[in-house]
UniProtKB/Swiss-Prot annotation:
Residues 317-328 have a biased composition (Acidic residues). Its main location: cytoplasm. The gene is IML2. This is Inclusion body clearance protein IML2. It comes from Candida albicans (strain SC5314 / ATCC MYA-2876) (Yeast). It comes from the Eukaryota. Pfam families: Iml2-TPR_39. It is found in: Cytoplasm; Nucleus.
């Protein structure tokens, strides 16, 4: 295995390739032109197919790839980008739903893409095909190899039923991808000055046409001014007036590729909210090429004759072409691709619009955006955006790994830097109009607004940021480091701008509706979030093809309904999920049962009014029993419905963390049944199950004040009579069982967080200190910190100390007149260190707890530098 990996590494070594000639002008011969344009054409086809996926038209995209691949069955020239494009599409579907069949299919396709990339790299080296003006032959297939290897490794790591050998293979793949991406990224950074110099030169030559001077890099045809940037080594000095069949064919092929790129960037290919005949990105009135064509008196003389074009029209790759070489190079730190569509505003009723409407910005330069798009080749676009996306994801993912594991990985060459990774992803999302840009946006949205807390926004200095100085991301061709500093400080002000663009470009995909719903929920507008998501699925015109996207949308909508205490709607969605997704039927059903239990309690406490209280209580008690039993039957290795079925991530029969949580809660209930045999199951549950569950989906940070007040009351349902924040008194009892100390710790933990979100910071901290932390911490000072090892609810003990960190931060930063950031950071970090100590080891939900602690630590480190 290791020998095979070393062989692949040597084939794709950037260092060995760099020993070849690095400038395309000295490499490409006339006989290579058809092969080069064929490869560029393949990349445009692949990018177009992946755009269809982003618009939830996966079948259209896969059909396009298969049709193009079938045309080349007898060709000796490999087409590695096709299996990679298909693999990317299958990877997205696989990681949305973690369904075993889809994951296995994606793994197979990505493995084929790895081998195809190796073959294509060798082919380009053999024939010295330089598809880029700066990078050595085969560099683009280094990137395709790294991308397919990275995605394949991630799939293998997410497949829980893999043994040690498969896991080792996945780590080696990940390391290979890391090394390759790191090498190409360094090359991109080194080449930035060359790129900037030659981009300026290309623009200057285009402008010179306005004075009648012929350009080596621009062809002016009847309809368009076409850059020859996609064909390194080719000069257009005489081509625009040539009538030779090979020159005319070459120009037709260049024009075809140019129009494909133009259409993709404009979004005209997808025909969403845009009339392709009316939108012409590169014919902007201020474009350097348009100005050149309009002011050139020799334009009519330079047109390619229509008759010749019609008589000699060929597809890409059929004819050679002859021309002199040039000396241009092309590379950049940031790839300057930006959507400059002149489209009507999106029909999205969200807070994103209200935020954007109040922004005071200076307009971006559409001229620079369009010119840069025109003068950057498809291959260089792919290299830059692909490396930025993959390397950015790797950096962020590695930075999220808990410290103990991270130290081990760093020894073998894995070092994550969240700051570097996020900058790469933001740059890609802002400036790239291809699948890499949209995937970068998806990653950013999940990172900041997803249900799992990867970044802790609670650690913030008061009165930070000025909304009136928001940067407009519309038509941005480049983004500076200073601008990224501003964006990273207040990311929520910029995700809405990028999401608006994606919704406009890809209106049919439920993924973008899901992300808008998440963003609205993160902003606290839960009603609009559920309405947006519900309206989309209720509309018969919206047919969701990607079932995994539908499952994600429905699950997130269910959690938001829970935050609003709309438990019937939430349970309906959760039960529906078992028909469309196999991620964890046990968890879906357990959450549904917990919703029915909470509805039972709301009726009993008269929080909601019903016509027949006893009848409704009996109804929801019965529903709780039904779905709790059904949930247990689907737990892998436990229930009869799980026999022979694959559950969990990647289809293993192992129990996931929430399966273990479910079983632990079930054991507690069974123990109480023995103690209270005459009570219905709904009356022997302790602290609210659903309010405990939503903590893991960041629910308390998303609730409105009204929802938090209701949550505080519902959590008091199980409290001991006359205890703090209990709903029970000696004269009015809702709970029919005694509250144990362990259950009280869970209740006070959740009520403390609820009070903090309501603004009662001191009261919330009092509950946490007096009723939770004091129960297991023996010695508080960090240098002699000691604690009891408790097991009733394993996640509570480190998590309570993590939440104490947040309380300390808020208390130390609320007085701006006496604010000492350094002291606040140090005191908060000391409590976070205690959380790390208590949280060491593998326990139920340890990964989620570890990620929360890691996110808070990284944020505090960042604040310490301010």
């Amino acid at each position: 295995m290791l020998k095979g990996l070393r062989k692949k590494a040597s084939i794709l070594s950037l260092g060995s390739m760099a020993s070849q000639q690095s400038t395309s002008s000295a490499i490409n011969s006339e006989s290579n032109y058809d092969k080069i344009l064929t490869q560029v054409y393949d990349f445009e086809i692949a990018l177009k197919a992946m755009d269809y996926l982003l618009d939830d038209r996966t079948k259209t995209g896969t059909d396009l790839l298969q049709n193009e691949a079938s045309k080349n069955n007898n060709s000796e020239q490999p087409h590695a980008i096709f299996p990679l494009a298909l693999g990317v599409m299958e990877f997205i579907e696989a990681t949305l739903g973690f369904e075993p069949e889809v994951m296995a299919k994606a793994h197979k396709t990505l493995s084929e893409a790895e081998n195809a990339s190796l073959n294509n790299s060798k082919y380009n080296l053999k024939y010295q095909l330089a598809t880029s003006m700066i990078y050595p032959p085969g560099t683009e297939f280094q990137v395709t190899f790294a991308e397919s290897t990275l995605l394949n490794a991630l799939l293998m790591l997410l497949t829980e039923n893999n043994g040690m050998v498969e896991s080792a293979k996945a780590l080696f793949k990940l390391r290979r991808a890391y090394q390759t991406l790191d090498a190409v990224y360094k090359k991109i950074k080194e080449s930035e000055p060359i790129f900037n110099k030659n981009l300026a030169k290309l623009k200057k030559e285009a402008a010179m046409q306005g004075n009648g001077t012929k350009s080596n890099s621009i062809i002016t045809t009847e309809n368009f001014s076409i850059s020859t940037v996609d064909l390194p080594g080719y000069s257009s000095q005489t081509s625009s007036t040539s009538s030779l069949p090979q020159d005319i064919s070459l120009m037709k092929n260049l024009e075809k590729i140019y129009l494909m790129r133009k259409s993709r960037i404009e979004g005209a290919t997808l025909a969403n909210n845009v009339n392709p005949e009316r939108v012409n990105l590169f014919e902007d009135s201020n474009s350097s090429l348009t100005l050149a064509k309009q002011s050139n008196p020799k334009y009519e003389e330079q047109r390619v004759d229509n008759a010749n074009n019609n008589n000699n029209s060929h597809d890409v790759g059929e004819d050679d072409s002859s021309s002199s070489d040039n000396e241009y190079c092309d590379a950049s730190e940031e790839f300057d691709i930006e959507d400059t569509l002149n489209l009507p505003p999106p029909q999205i009723h969200s807070s994103a619009q209200s935020v954007l409407s109040s922004i005071e910005t200076s307009p971006s330069s559409a001229q620079n955006a369009s010119d840069n798009h025109l003068h950057v080749s498809t291959i260089d676009e792919y290299i830059h955006s692909g490396v930025q996306l993959c390397f950015g994801i790797l950096q962020v993912v590695l930075s999220l790994i808990p410290p103990a594991i991270g130290k081990v990985l760093s020894i073998v060459g894995f070092r994550g830097d969240r700051e570097v990774g996020l900058r790469l992803l933001w740059r890609t999302a802002i400036t790239c109009r291809n699948v890499h840009g949209e995937l970068a946006l998806l990653f950013i949205l999940v990172f900041y607004d997803g249900p799992v807390q990867f970044v802790d926004n609670g650690f913030r200095l008061p009165d930070q940021g000025n909304d009136k100085k928001i940067i407009s991301l519309d038509n941005k061709a480049t983004v500076s480091e200073a601008e990224l500093d501003i964006i990273l400080e207040r990311p929520e002000l910029y995700t809405s701008q990028l999401l608006r663009r994606a919704r406009r470009m890809f209106p049919h995909n439920a993924l973008w509706i899901l992300q808008e719903g998440r963003m609205l929920a993160a902003e606290g507008d839960l009603a609009l979030a559920t309405k947006t998501m519900q309206d989309f699925t209720d509309d018969p015109a919206n047919e969701i093809q990607m079932q995994q996207a539908e499952a994600l949308l429905v699950f997130d909508r269910a959690t938001i309904y829970i935050y609003q205490h709309e438990y019937d709607n939430a349970a309906r969605d959760l039960i529906y999920l078992i028909d469309i997704n196999s991620w964890s039927k046990a968890v879906y059903l357990f959450m549904a049962a917990s919703c029915y239990l909470e509805k039972y309690r709301m009726i009993k406490m008269d929080i909601i009014s019903v016509d027949n209280k006893e009848s409704e209580m009996a109804k929801y008690s019965s529903l709780f029993d039904k779905y709790l039993d059904l949930a247990l039957s689907y737990v892998p290795g436990h229930g009869h419905n799980a026999v022979g079925k694959k559950g969990g991530i990647g289809g293993s029969n192992k129990q996931m963390p929430f399966d273990k949580f479910l079983l632990r809660k079930s054991r507690h209930i069974e123990a109480r049944k023995k103690k209270y045999p005459n009570l219905p199951t709904a009356d022997i549950v302790g602290t609210s199950l659903i309010h405990e569950l939503i903590y893991f989906w960041n629910g308390y940070n998303r609730m409105s004040s009204h929802d938090l007040e209701i949550a505080l009351k519902l959590l008091g349902y199980s409290g001991a009579p006359n205890s703090e924040y209990s709903a029970n008194t000696n004269g009015n009892l809702y709970a029919l069982i005694e509250e144990t100390e362990d259950e009280a710790m869970i209740r006070y933990f959740l009520q403390g967080i609820t009070l903090r979100q309501l603004g009662s910071i001191n009261d919330g901290l009092g509950l946490l200190d007096n009723h939770v932390i004091s129960k297991y911490v023996i010695s508080e000072p960090l240098h002699q910190f000691r604690f009891h090892k408790m097991t009733y609810s394993p996640y509570i003990y480190p998590t309570a100390l993590y939440e104490k960190t947040m309380f300390v931060w808020l208390l130390r930063t609320k007085n701006t007149a006496k604010l000492d950031v350094h002291q606040a950071v140090q005191e908060s970090k000391s409590w976070l260190k205690r959380a790390e100590i208590v949280g060491e080891g593998d326990y139920e939900l340890s990964n989620r707890t570890g990620m929360r602690i890691k996110a808070a630590g990284d944020r505090l480190e960042q604040l310490a530098t301010l």
